[in-house]
Amino acid sequence: MQEVISYIQKAVLEISNALKFPDTSYSQNQNFTGDTQLKFDVLSDGIITKTLSQCSSIKAIISEEKDEILTLNERANFIVAYDPLDGSSLMDVNFAIGSIFAIYEEKASAKNLRAALYSMYGARLELVICKDQPKLYRLNANNEFIFIKDLKMNEKGKINATGGTQKFWEEKHAKFIKSLFDEGYRLRYSGAMVSDINQILLKGGGIFSYPATQDAPNGKLRAFFEVFPLAFIIEKAGGKTTNGKNHSLLELEFDKIHATTPCFFGSEYEISKLLKAYNE
């Protein structure tokens, strides 16, 4: 699996370099779920596909920007699912964005998830790699990823990152969010899931939520590319996840590779509070 991780690092570095002079315009294409693709979405996906295709340990890749699974080597063991550029719609305002990767063994399912990674393209290039414990790495002047620290969640945080159009929230979710603000939580929502999860991890706690809404009853975030890998990282850091019913997002099973789900990630206190509010 270390070989797979090393190729992901190469792809991340190439995307980071390309971001220095990006084309932020939209293409004429849409991805499987109907999102209009930025030209840089397509470029990033191409960089990752090209790089991972050189790794003999990868059986197949699944991209948010591809309709189907792409088989690379049927004799290999690992399947890599990825969002090539999470938060790409924020490129024109120069917000921090990132790439998300999940490494599955033999079959793409939460129970077969062996490692998860994400990169942050911000003021500096950082990479979080998680097998047993999330570890933060930072690119140095020699183009090497240097270990910075292990990432751990506190039992309770102060950050509230909540998505979904408010007018479409269910009443129970609106009440829950209000209760957090009543406790003094700070709103920290950028519109890039990877950036918001990264802030919660590095600050040690809080909650990220993207609930079921009237216009998206199954949520909008994709299980295999976004939800499972970030849930894996949060839980390995000592945090909790749920879809509002299950006690872990990693308990969920889906047949379709572009399946979506409501999702909540956070410290133990916030997730316990949410489950109580949702199931009263």
Curated annotation (Swiss-Prot):
Protein name: Fructose-1,6-bisphosphatase class 1
Pathway(s) it belongs to: Carbohydrate biosynthesis; gluconeogenesis
Domain of life: Bacteria
Catalytic activity: beta-D-fructose 1,6-bisphosphate + H2O = beta-D-fructose 6-phosphate + phosphate
Keywords assigned by UniProt, alphabetized: Carbohydrate metabolism, Cytoplasm, Hydrolase, Magnesium, Metal-binding
Entry cofactors: Mg(2+)
Gene Ontology MF terms: fructose 1,6-bisphosphate 1-phosphatase activity; magnesium ion binding
Top EC class of this enzyme: hydrolase
Localization: Cytoplasm
Chain positions recorded as Mg(2+) 2 binding sites: 83, 86, 226
Keyword Repeat recorded: no
Pfam families: FBPase, FBPase_C
Residues binding Mg(2+) 1, per UniProt: 64, 83, 85
Gene Ontology terms: cellular component: cytosol
Originating species: Campylobacter jejuni subsp. jejuni serotype O:6 (strain 81116 / NCTC 11828)
Known partners and oligomeric status: Homotetramer.
InterPro entries attached to this UniProt entry: FBPase_C_dom, FBPase_class-1, FBPase_N, FBPtase, SBPase
Binding site for substrate: 86-89, 189, 220
Family per similarity comment: Belongs to the FBPase class 1 family.
Primary site of residence: cytoplasm
Biological process annotations from GO: fructose 1,6-bisphosphate metabolic process; fructose 6-phosphate metabolic process; fructose metabolic process; gluconeogenesis; sucrose biosynthetic process
EC number: 3.1.3.11
Gene3D superfamilies named among the record's database cross-references: 3.40.190.80, Fructose-1,6-Bisphosphatase, subunit A, domain 1
PANTHER family: FRUCTOSE-1,6-BISPHOSPHATASE-RELATED (PTHR11556), SEDOHEPTULOSE-1,7-BISPHOSPHATASE, CHLOROPLASTIC (PTHR11556:SF35)
Cofactor binding annotation: Binds 2 magnesium ions per subunit.
